[in-house]
Amino acid sequence: MRRPSGRRITALAAAGLLLPALAACGSDDSGAGAGNAGNAGNKDSSLVIYSGRNEKLIKPLLGELEKAVGTKVEVRYGDSAELAAQILEEGRRTKAGLFFSQDAGALGALSKEGRLQKLPPATLDKVDKAYRGSDGDWVGLSGRVRVLAYNPDEVREDKLPDSVLDVVKPEWKDKTGFAPTNASFQAFVTGMRVLEGDDATRTWLKDLKANGAKAYANNLAVLDAVESGEVSLGLVNHYYWYERVAEKGEDKVAARLHFLPGKDPGALINVAGAGVLKDTGQSEAAQKALDFLLSKKAQTYFADETKEYPLAAGVTSSVKDLPPFASLESPDIDLGKLESLQQTLTMLQEQGLV
């Protein structure tokens, strides 16, 4: 599917020491480190949220959130992987009632360890089953799709690859940019492992490097390289382009986006989502907070601020030229399986990519 308009090194230290499976599950937009969560307030007098999404995004919603919950809300910001690892280390002593993750992998890890509470059908039914936990213990709140950014001065639209697997072909030698240390790229590779298998993914990574793909620090740097013509293609999340267009105007942005067809691994949709923690004494307040985050007001806010797709039924994005969510040809995958990021990191290290 071709459409016309086309965050930070992985958390390894703290999360890796606490839970190897989470070592690579870093947040793209996290604020301060997970240590900020350690001094959360009294859970009996307020709701405490551990948030892998940053303060700049969450703070404007706090007033409305407290009204919806009916009590004071404290938010502790950090990297999603580190926060999830901290929750597992704290066990029933955790002061968090709600975990708001930047990605599905961290939620999948908590679900796997039995730390999330089953959610009521009324909450689950607000989100398509593809974007919630298979055990019914977390839901996605907003989605982002992997795309190819391309420079139309360097490559014609009708010559674009139909699969991310094709960027290792000779015609794309030295022409592809990617961000191997970025959490979103690592989640994409994890998705490829789930969909295509470890052997095929390992071969693709080896071929990607051999084909001269250029590594950059993050998605924005990849987009910059596409813009300048340094590379013809870039592997990124969709919203970086839309944020740049909102800032500069489409006529000032050279790059365009290619939404891959056919349920390609390169069209993976990952989500930011949330789950209610078990045995914290905050279940009722946490559930109210989660339902607020699925409300039209909150969903519209996230869509407008992040350019991500709202996931609650009945809410659509107002972002100009963003393809309808239903039109995306994303692969069928259990997003909870993205928790196996440690294996991905090992694979990337073996290929000399991180």
Give residue ranges: language-model regions.
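An extracytoplasmic/periplasmic, membrane-proximal ligand-sensing/linker region
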Residues: 199-200, 308-354
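Early extracytoplasmic/lumenal segment of secretory-pathway proteins
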Residues: 26-29, 35-108
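Periplasmic-binding protein-like
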Residues: 144, 175-180, 205-209, 215-216, 251-278, 292-315
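A bilobed periplasmic-binding-protein/Venus flytrap-type ligand-binding module shared by bacterial periplasmic
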Residues: 149-154, 193, 269-282, 301-305
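C-terminal motif of bacterial Sec signal peptides marking the signal peptidase cleavage site
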Residues: 20-24
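A ligand-binding cleft/hinge motif common to bilobed small-molecule-binding domains
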Residues: 105-109, 232-254
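Extracytoplasmic ligand-binding site segments that recognize negatively charged/polar headgroups
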Residues: 51-59, 78-82, 94-231, 265
